Amino acid sequence: GEKMQKIRLAAMRLKIRIRPVEKAEYAQTIAALCGAEDAREAAYTGAGFEDEMLVMANFPAGMMNTFLGLFRRMGIAPVALKAMLTPTNAAWDSEKLHEELAGEHRAMTNGEGKRHQG
């Protein structure tokens, strides 16, 4: 949609390659989806999820902040579930990464709510 087009434009400005992931690819490891290893023969049969996720891989120092700052300047709504490729999450599939990021996001959101209540 429109948000994806804006994200592509932001990425092009910084010479970042964007790769959308289709539901059929959710069984692949995050490393394979990021091009860090070969894809495996694996069919995804799960229910999937609707939340958008953003995984950043091979970003030089400071690039993530520059990229996300460009989101703000271009009026692109934040992506709540985002991660850098790490040795830990590289072996996960999309569903496992989604589960972990959604849990972290809920914990942060709940934590902020509690802090404001006093």
What function would you assign to each model-found segment?
Residues 1-36:
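N-terminal, charge-rich interaction modules
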Residues 1-7, 108-113, 117:
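Surface-exposed interaction/gating patches
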Residues 1-3, 60-63, 88-92:
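Gly/Ser/Thr-rich loops at beta-strand to alpha-helix junctions
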Residues 19, 79, 105-109, 113:
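Residue-level signal for secondary-structure boundary elements
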Residues 31, 57, 97-100:
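Basic helix-extension-helix modules of the SAP/HeH family
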Residues 38-46, 99-111:
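A polyampholytic, Gly/Pro-enriched intrinsically disordered region
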Residues 43-74:
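Mid-chain, well-packed structural core segment of small domains
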Residues 68-104:
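Ser/Thr/Gly-rich flexible loops in soluble cytosolic domains mediating phosphotransfer, phosphorylation
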